[in-house]
């Protein structure tokens, strides 16, 4: 990603995503190039509610939430392409996850860097290559497939 770099703060993210606490998992967009990719971050705090039970003696961010954070970054990339007509009534759904791999634990105090690259758009399905890193090391990776629906048209 290079040429035109767009970054978004939490205030702009809140206008684009319907997610709210405790499931909003993107704190800032560091770089976004429409139709190419996005680099975002999630600051992982000990105050996250999931750490109470996963795991109390050795808190680890659940892998499915890392994938969710990557999907939220993908949604921001999608909405940069195609601004929803009614953002408050627009939902972004997973339709598939392929090749998910978890390579390292994510712990309180880590800064999760979310890198998502656009691959293709076919028949209403967006496909992305997604990699989450901590300190330059891959924590998780997957291919994500998502679709956009209005809340009243959702399954």
From Swiss-Prot:
Q: Which InterPro entries match?
A: FabA_FabZ (IPR013114), FabZ (IPR010084), HotDog_dom_sf (IPR029069)
Coarsely, its chief localization is: cytoplasm
* Recorded catalytic activity of this chain's protein: a (3R)-hydroxyacyl-[ACP] = a (2E)-enoyl-[ACP] + H2O
Carries keyword Chloroplast? no
Q: Its GO biological process terms?
A: fatty acid biosynthetic process; lipid A biosynthetic process
Q: Which Gene3D superfamilies match?
A: Hotdog Thioesterase
The name of this protein is 3-hydroxyacyl-[acyl-carrier-protein] dehydratase FabZ
Species in which this protein is naturally found = Burkholderia cenocepacia (strain HI2424)
Lineage, uppermost ranks: Bacteria, Pseudomonadati, Pseudomonadota, Betaproteobacteria, Burkholderiales
Gene responsible for this protein: fabZ
């Amino acid at each position: 990603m290079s040429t035109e770099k767009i970054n978004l703060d939490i205030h702009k993210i809140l206008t684009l995503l319907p997610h709210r606490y405790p499931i909003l998992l993107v704190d800032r967009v560091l770089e976004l190039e429409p139709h190419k990719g996005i680099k975002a971050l999630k600051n992982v705090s000990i105050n996250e509610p999931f750490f109470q039970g996963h795991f109390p003696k050795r808190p680890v961010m659940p892998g499915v939430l890392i994938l969710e954070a990557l999907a939220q970054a993908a949604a921001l990339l999608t909405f940069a392409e195609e601004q929803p007509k009614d953002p408050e009534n627009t939902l972004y759904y997973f339709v598939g996850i392929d090749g998910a791999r978890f390579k390292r634990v994510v712990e309180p105090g880590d800064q999760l860097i979310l890198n998502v690259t656009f691959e293709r758009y076919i028949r209403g399905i967006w496909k992305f290559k997604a990699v989450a890193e901590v300190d330059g090391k891959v924590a998780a990776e997957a291919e994500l497939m998502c679709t956009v629906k209005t809340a009243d048209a959702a399954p």
